[in-house]
């Protein structure tokens, strides 16, 4: 939740830098889970903190990736807000979820391990092959993970391994869940519109266009051009008559704090072409832009994490997490939380009026 650290060495390639952003998010989730901000028994199964370099000072055990209170609180609010939107999608009869740039995310397992799991038809996670490969290995290694890969209506986990691994270990498929290795970006010589062909060729076969579908994009679009991210939103809006999208983004990168964030990202060989959507209003407007044509969503909204803290989390939950760690700098917390936003768009009658 803070501007990304500058202590990791600069990535040699921008894709390596993207991988490091997943490390940041996964280690933040692990920290929040270990300290009691989140209930997530799967975070430690899908992510392991990197071993310290030989001779490096390691004041904490490798298995405990503790983050500062500011990051833990931000991770809680991010998870709280997105979870509420996902739950409301499911309560309206949502059947399919596509997580773009899923990385080490645990949401599928958190959903399916509930006492009453949702009646999902398909859950698809997409990321670069060098990120899906270790995730597929971890899923295959832990029964606590692969036991949930069967049909969602199955009361008991199926015997054996309910999945297949393909594409050199980078893809894992089951009747309910697919981990798909895919680079959504067109080549430099291709137009942004070619993203639609990529999605139609690789992703659509995993889904049923007749079913209400949600796509999630957490900290993905900032690293894509506005044209590319618009094509993704447009494709979902055109392909599914009943659809919802949820994005988690950085905003306000043109102020002094935002400039610090950009400089720290630049040190790590990361640019943010999507930063032109600098306000919650402009983030929501991506779903209803006339440029989407037939893929335009019916309604949209957005809230900063600070607004979610003030309006949605609730006093009992805020009191609970306030007892976990001492956090004195509320103004600093507000500054950070106002630079992150959750935006959503809905299309179709059964998805109408979903919001935070």
Swiss-Prot record:
It comes from the Eukaryota. Pfam families: LCM (PF04072). S-adenosyl-L-methionine binds at residues 78, 101, 127, 183-184, 218. Keywords: Methyltransferase, S-adenosyl-L-methionine, Transferase. Its EC number is 2.1.1.233. Coiled coil: none annotated. The keyword S-adenosyl-L-methionine applies. InterPro entries: LCMT1 (IPR016651), Ppm1/Ppm2/Tcmp (IPR007213), SAM-dependent_MTases_sf (IPR029063). One of its GO terms (biological process) is methylation. It is an enzyme of class 2 (transferase). Belongs to the methyltransferase superfamily. LCMT family. Methylates the carboxyl group of the C-terminal leucine residue of protein phosphatase 2A catalytic subunits to form alpha-leucine ester residues. This is Leucine carboxyl methyltransferase 1. It comes from Cryptococcus neoformans var. neoformans serotype D (strain JEC21 / ATCC MYA-565) (Filobasidiella neoformans). The lineage of its organism: Eukaryota, Fungi, Dikarya, Basidiomycota, Agaricomycotina. The gene is PPM1.
């Amino acid at each position: 939740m803070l501007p990304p650290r500058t202590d990791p060495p600069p990535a040699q390639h921008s894709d390596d830098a993207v991988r490091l952003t997943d490390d940041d998010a996964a280690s933040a989730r692990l920290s929040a889970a270990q300290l009691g901000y989140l209930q997530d028994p799967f975070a430690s199964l899908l992510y392991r903190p990197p071993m310290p370099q030989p001779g490096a000072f390691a004041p904490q055990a490798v298995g405990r990736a503790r983050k500062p209170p500011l990051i833990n609180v931000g991770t809680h609010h991010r998870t709280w807000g997105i979870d509420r939107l996902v739950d409301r999608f499911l309560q309206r009869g949502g059947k399919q979820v596509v997580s773009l740039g899923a990385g080490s995310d645990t949401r599928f397992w958190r959903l399916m391990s509930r006492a009453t799991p949702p009646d999902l038809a398909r859950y698809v996670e997409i990321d670069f092959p060098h990120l899906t490969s270790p995730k597929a290995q971890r899923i295959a290694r832990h029964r606590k993970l692969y036991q949930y890969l069967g049909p969602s209506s199955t009361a008991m986990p199926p015997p054996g391994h309910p999945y297949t691994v393909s594409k050199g270990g980078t893809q894992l498929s089951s009747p309910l869940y697919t981990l798909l290795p895919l680079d959504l970006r067109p080549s430099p010589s291709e137009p942004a519109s070619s993203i639609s062909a990529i999605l139609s060729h690789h992703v659509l076969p995993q889904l049923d266009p007749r079913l209400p579908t949600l796509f999630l994009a957490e900290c993905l679009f900032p690293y894509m051009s506005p044209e590319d991210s618009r094509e993704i939103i447009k494709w979902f809006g055109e392909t599914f008559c009943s659809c919802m999208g949820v994005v988690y983004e950085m905003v306000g990168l043109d102020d002094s704090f935002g400039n610090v964030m950009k400089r720290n990202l630049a040190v790590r060989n990361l640019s943010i072409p999507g930063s032109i959507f600098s306000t919650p209003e402009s983030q929501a407007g991506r779903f209803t832009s006339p440029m989407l044509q037939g893929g335009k969503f019916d309604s949209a909204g957005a809230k900063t994490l600070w607004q979610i803290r003030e309006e949605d989390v609730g006093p009992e939950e805020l009191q609970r997490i306030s007892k976990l760690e001492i956090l004195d700098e509320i103004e600093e917390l507000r500054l950070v939380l106002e630079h992150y936003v959750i935006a959503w768009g809905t299309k179709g009658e059964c998805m109408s009026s979903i919001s935070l």
